[in-house]
Amino acid sequence: MEFIVCNGCGCSPSKRQFFITACSHVFCETCRTTPTADFCHLCKIPTKTLKMDASLPKNVKKMFGDVGVMSTDIHKRLARVIGFQKIQKSIQLKMENKKSVMRKEQTKKVEKKTEEMHCQLSKLTSFEENNRKKLEDIERENEKLRNLISALELKVASSRDIDDDEFFMQGTPTSSNPSVAGSDVDNDELLDYDLLGLRNRSDSSSSNCSSQSNRGGSLF
């Protein structure tokens, strides 16, 4: 430890026992005890001191180690730290890449599903439009059929009225005196028409004629 000298008088450790303070100052045994043992003559403050021998703690001994050896050891430890962190970064990067690939695949699936849904929606819209047009066509046809049915009902009703009128016209006798002698119309046939009470009138006419002929043969 050629770089170590007493921070008070400048002597080397080979001549006296040395002590190190908590504030990182080194004093020989003479300077340490002047004026008191636990006092730093440079910082002018009370402090703890340790005897510089084999009983020093490891963390304090490192302060007196060989710089070359320490640098090599530090380099090795630093290399291990760098290697460890590099491996961790590589693993993290692989995981991120894997997640990125999965996200891309999921995005493609979602886009494909969205496209399929748009296609289905377009088909449904077209199907709905076609059905609407068909319903409109059916409604127009139904309207035509309703109009046709109404016209047929009116025509049938009108035809029934005409048939009834013709029936009554055909059932009425055309002769004004069906019971007169010499008529070409058969009295039996005329008597069958009782629509207007002709039977009673025929019986009455026959009775009158008989009565007149009986009177014609008698003076009284």
Curated annotation (Swiss-Prot):
Molecular-function GO terms, alphabetical: SUMO transferase activity; zinc ion binding
Zinc finger (RING-type): 6-44
A GO term from the CC aspect: chromosome
Region of interest: Disordered: 166-186, 201-220
Location(s) in or outside the cell: Chromosome
Keyword list, A-Z: Chromosome, Coiled coil, DNA recombination, Meiosis, Metal-binding, Zinc, Zinc-finger
Free-text tissue specificity from the UniProt record: Expressed in the germline.
Pfam families for the chain: zf-RING_5 (PF14634)
Biased amino acid composition, Polar residues: 171-180
GO terms classed as biological process: homologous chromosome pairing at meiosis; reciprocal meiotic recombination
Residue ranges of coiled coil: 124-155
Chief location of this protein within or outside the cell: nucleus
Protein role: Recruited co-dependently with zhp-2 to the synaptonemal complex between homologous chromosome pairs to regulate the formation and number of crossover events between homologs during meiotic recombination. Together with zhp-2, promotes the accumulation of pro-crossover proteins, including zhp-3 and zhp-4, at a designated crossover site along the recombination intermediate. Limits the number of crossover sites along a recombination intermediate by restricting the association of these pro-crossover proteins with other recombination sites during late prophase.
Subunit structure: Interacts with zhp-2; the interaction is required for their chromosome association and stability.
PANTHER family found in the cross-reference section: RING FINGER PROTEIN NARYA-RELATED
Identification of the protein by name: Zip homologous protein 1
The gene coding this protein: zhp-1
